[in-house]
Amino acid sequence: MTAAGLLIAIGIVYGDIGTSPLYVMKSVIAGNGGINTVGRDLIIGTISLILWTVTLLTTVQTVIIALRATNHGEGGIFALYALIRKKAAWLVWPALIGGAAILADGTLTPAVTVTTAIEGLKGLEFGKGNVPVSNQTTVLVITIVILLVLFSIQRMGTRIIGKAFGPIMLVWFAFLGVMGLINIGGNWWILQALNPYYAIKLLFSPYNKAGFAILGSIFLATTGAEALYSDVGHVGKGNIIGSWPFVFVCLSLNYFGQGVWILNNTNMHSATEINPFYAMIPENIRLASIVLATLAAIIASQALITGSFTLVAESINLKFLPRMNILYPSDERGQIYIPAVNKMLGITTIALVLFFRTSAHMEAAYGLSITISMLTTTILLYEWLVLKQGHNLANLLFVIFFSTINILFMGSSLSKFTHGGYVSLLITLLIASVMVVWYFGNKVRDQNGAGNAYVRLDEYTDMLTNLSHDDNYPTYSDNLVYMANVKYNKFIKREILYSILDKRPKRARAYWFVTVNVTNEPFTAEYAVNTFGTKNVINIQLYLGFKKQTSVNVYLRQIVHDLIKDNTIEAQPQEYTTTPGRDVGDFKFVIVNDVISPSTTLSSYKKWLVKARVQLQNLSLNPAQWFGLEFADMVIERVPLILGKQEHERIKRVAPVDYSKTSLNKK
């Protein structure tokens, strides 16, 4: 834990939870009929609910318990799943659903935080009688412009602007605390909210018109708690533990201050439109506060966008999602940019802004997906605790207590289902469906694909060598290159050899099997060779840094020259060439894709699952782009994907019909 580390943590981790004061109290007041209908008991109970929700779900569950469950220093729901996935097969379900819910939140957080911040400008005078932002349409235009700029700059990375995140968020939290203290004044009776009795009492009190549905608004105070866990790998456990007390105190003071201001201004009009956060700020600094709030909202949105990129990259590694083009704007592997994800996030976020139009409507959708992710994380945490400590009463009480709390919040969020909650759920289900199809489609294919099993490449080297010298077959290419994942330097998918040997035998001077391995270093450019004691069967393991372009065509030509030079393989002199002395022949690259065979005997559901998985593969990253083969001679071959038990019904032979005795023959 260092001062610099604490500052970085404040800038990266707390953006989402740090912007919650912008809309939590506003949502509670609107749900109870407006500012002129609330009383002291409601406000004290509300703040008590907020403080104890943040204490239990953020401080206890996340900071005290979840931060212990790191995977080589990395946190988050997928890192947690990776720790326990061998324990039980069903654990993949909470991991998939929770991950999908967090990705869904990545579209909602930028929409609601930026819109809420900009709404503070509405009705604000710039000079005498000049009100440039007088309606919601203007708010939407400004919000969309900010979001467009935010998503457009992602390709450049956040290394430079990211240095400002810490100082800006430090000022933001200090501002929250100071504004809270100013509005508390001498009204220290508000500290009664520290007593959880008032939180429980509020849920059953008649002056709480929203009933248990109030929890849907209260939960907004702890959205962003999952970031403390998922970002632990970026900023370090010690820096999160050290910075959280400061953040918690500043948030608490601001909620106290809003509560006092509300009770001192219950006679105001515009009952449901008042935002106590902005209203309690003195007019002479309100514009500055809106600018600061907008910056905090942008930083919160940036954190969610960056987190979404990281989550998708982890999903790809766990085979929850198909392969995508991942770029690295800086020399640090943690700084990634996924164009497809950025485009989908940007389009969805702006569509949500246009659909809901106001932050009040967005708040109805916001929160539901996070309650889902928190519940699934609780389940996975319990399994991790059992794995580490065994079954005991403490672990059982943990899962019962926190699952009950999360289910209560989920139920209250579902009360807003028809008012916008369905949007959050639909986005979550859509993402989860893609994950389910890809993950279980792969499972079905691997478990039932006898024809796609791995075989030993060294057992086929003699056959490949003989084919290379067999004049009965025309030369298909001088160098036939298969992009194949060769495991342990010798195991290769049978479908690759099927393509060479069974599908019109392909004669070549040299057969190349290339595996691309991405390393944790940014600029690695190395290769290893295994020829299996031959001159024309070569397994190449490429080791490329995560910032290196995967230009297999360029690298392979250099490798061929190196191997010819040291006599590892034979030269390939060319009789007809524009380059005198050329000793390397042509290259043909082959990508093998699966196509479901009609002989597949799987159940209808499993067959549909594999077909859907193949369709997703076709829609994902083009192999030519992935391997840098856009200008190479490349073919994509389809091989039959035969799944399930093969049952070939025998056909019975009969004697031919004797037409000599028919009337047709007599004519």
Curated annotation (Swiss-Prot):
<keyword id="KW-0472">Membrane</keyword>
<feature type="transmembrane region" description="Helical">
    <location>
        <begin position="287"/>
        <end position="307"/>
    </location>
</feature>
<keyword id="KW-1133">Transmembrane helix</keyword>
<dbReference type="InterPro" id="IPR003855">
    <property type="entry name" value="K+_transporter"/>
</dbReference>
<feature type="transmembrane region" description="Helical">
    <location>
        <begin position="47"/>
        <end position="67"/>
    </location>
</feature>
<feature type="transmembrane region" description="Helical">
    <location>
        <begin position="210"/>
        <end position="230"/>
    </location>
</feature>
<feature type="transmembrane region" description="Helical">
    <location>
        <begin position="420"/>
        <end position="440"/>
    </location>
</feature>
<feature type="transmembrane region" description="Helical">
    <location>
        <begin position="393"/>
        <end position="413"/>
    </location>
</feature>
<protein>
    <recommendedName>
        <fullName>Probable potassium transport system protein Kup</fullName>
    </recommendedName>
</protein>
<keyword id="KW-1003">Cell membrane</keyword>
<dbReference type="GO" id="GO:0015293">
    <property type="term" value="F:symporter activity"/>
</dbReference>
<feature type="transmembrane region" description="Helical">
    <location>
        <begin position="367"/>
        <end position="387"/>
    </location>
</feature>
<comment type="function">
    <text>Transport of potassium into the cell. Likely operates as a K(+):H(+) symporter.</text>
</comment>
<keyword id="KW-0630">Potassium</keyword>
<keyword id="KW-0406">Ion transport</keyword>
<keyword id="KW-0812">Transmembrane</keyword>
<dbReference type="InterPro" id="IPR053952">
    <property type="entry name" value="K_trans_C"/>
</dbReference>
<keyword id="KW-0633">Potassium transport</keyword>
<feature type="transmembrane region" description="Helical">
    <location>
        <begin position="88"/>
        <end position="108"/>
    </location>
</feature>
<dbReference type="GO" id="GO:0015079">
    <property type="term" value="F:potassium ion transmembrane transporter activity"/>
</dbReference>
<dbReference type="InterPro" id="IPR023051">
    <property type="entry name" value="Kup"/>
</dbReference>
<dbReference type="Pfam" id="PF22776">
    <property type="entry name" value="K_trans_C"/>
</dbReference>
<keyword id="KW-0813">Transport</keyword>
<dbReference type="InterPro" id="IPR053951">
    <property type="entry name" value="K_trans_N"/>
</dbReference>
<keyword id="KW-0769">Symport</keyword>
<comment type="similarity">
    <text>Belongs to the HAK/KUP transporter (TC 2.A.72) family.</text>
</comment>
<feature type="transmembrane region" description="Helical">
    <location>
        <begin position="243"/>
        <end position="263"/>
    </location>
</feature>
<feature type="transmembrane region" description="Helical">
    <location>
        <begin position="133"/>
        <end position="153"/>
    </location>
</feature>
<feature type="transmembrane region" description="Helical">
    <location>
        <begin position="336"/>
        <end position="356"/>
    </location>
</feature>
<dbReference type="GO" id="GO:0005886">
    <property type="term" value="C:plasma membrane"/>
</dbReference>
<feature type="transmembrane region" description="Helical">
    <location>
        <begin position="5"/>
        <end position="25"/>
    </location>
</feature>
<feature type="transmembrane region" description="Helical">
    <location>
        <begin position="164"/>
        <end position="184"/>
    </location>
</feature>
<dbReference type="Pfam" id="PF02705">
    <property type="entry name" value="K_trans"/>
</dbReference>
